[in-house]
């Protein structure tokens, strides 16, 4: 269902200011004004009637419609597959109405969650409580300067070594394992980006392929461009991955002890 959709608290203003004469957007324009009329109870509301609460509610309204239409179509024509949403960006984790409607329509929410060494438990709890659904992290990574790559591209933070990348992986995923609603994660990505930032087009099997400029010259992979594993990173990943279920049992037992002590 698309990927990394935009989040804008001024979405309502943007729709209201569309041109009603524009064939591409006149339905969106009319829908926004009809919504505002219904929400304010006024026949001729103005932008002065818009509150912060209405701005948040309209964002939820848009995503409710998007997820309803998308999930309904997928379930009609592809009923045997889960609906995983749109890989929400980090900014969505504090949008309660988006989370609630996503949880209503999706089988599992997905997030590309950057900007945290480990995600604070209160943020994970906020997503869990509002979505009331399982979710997974579909992108996260750091880049190591010891790779020899420039590392100026991409959303992941920069660290000094591959061991520090491994430390980040362990810290980040241990926090995820503490959260009962998290069902998995996906490191971005398997192989490093091309080290040549000047290459925008590259011939692959006789076909000219365009490369996104965010996908060059960065140590995102668990293997290099020559398919050599970053051993320190891989070993740290393996240590966590082989013990996932034991770690879940540990955190569950810890939660049970805390709950018993509070009774």
What is each residue range found by the language model?
Residues 1-97:
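Polysaccharide-binding and catalytic clefts of secreted carbohydrate-active enzymes
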Residues 40-56, 90, 130-172, 179, ...:
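Active-site clefts of carbohydrate-active enzymes
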Residues 64-72, 121-125, 169, 173:
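Generic structural signal for well-ordered alpha-helices
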Residues 74, 109, 139, 185:
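Conserved, mostly hydrophobic/aromatic
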Residues 78-83, 104-107, 131-135, 178-184:
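Loop/turn elements at helix/coil->beta-strand transitions in domains of secreted/extracellular proteins
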Residues 83-123, 191-202, 214-217:
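Substrate-binding cleft/loops of secretory-pathway carbohydrate-active enzymes
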Residues 188-263:
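Aromatic-rich peripheral "rim/lid" segments of glycoside hydrolase catalytic domains that contact
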């Amino acid at each position: 269902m698309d990927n990394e959709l935009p989040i804008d608290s001024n979405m309502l203003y943007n729709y209201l200011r569309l041109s009603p004469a524009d064939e591409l957007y006149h339905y969106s324009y009319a829908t926004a004004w009809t919504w505002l009329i219904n929400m304010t109870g006024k026949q001729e509301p103005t932008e002065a009637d818009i509150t912060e609460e209405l701005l948040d509610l309209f964002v939820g309204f848009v995503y409710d419609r998007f997820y309803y239409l998308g999930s309904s179509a997928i379930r009609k024509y592809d009923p045997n597959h889960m609906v995983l949403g749109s890989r929400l960006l980090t900014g969505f984790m504090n949008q309660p109405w988006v989370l609630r409607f996503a949880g209503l329509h999706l089988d599992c929410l997905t997030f590309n969650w950057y900007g945290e060494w480990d995600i604070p438990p209160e943020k994970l709890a906020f997503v869990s409580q509002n979505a009331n659904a399982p979710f997974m992290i579909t992108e996260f990574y750091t880049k190591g300067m010891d790779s020899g790559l420039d590392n100026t591209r991409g959303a992941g933070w920069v660290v000094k070594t591959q061991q520090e990348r491994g430390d980040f992986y362990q810290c980040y995923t241990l926090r995820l394992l503490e959260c009962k609603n998290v069902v998995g994660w996906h490191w971005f990505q398997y192989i490093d980006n091309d080290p040549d930032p000047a290459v925008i087009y590259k011939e692959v099997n006789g076909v000219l392929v365009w490369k996104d400029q965010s996908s060059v010259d960065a140590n995102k992979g668990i293997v290099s461009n020559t398919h050599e594993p970053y051993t320190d990173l891989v070993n740290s990943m393996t240590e966590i991955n082989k013990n996932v279920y034991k770690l879940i049992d540990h955190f569950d037992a810890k939660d049970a002890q805390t709950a018993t002590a509070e009774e």
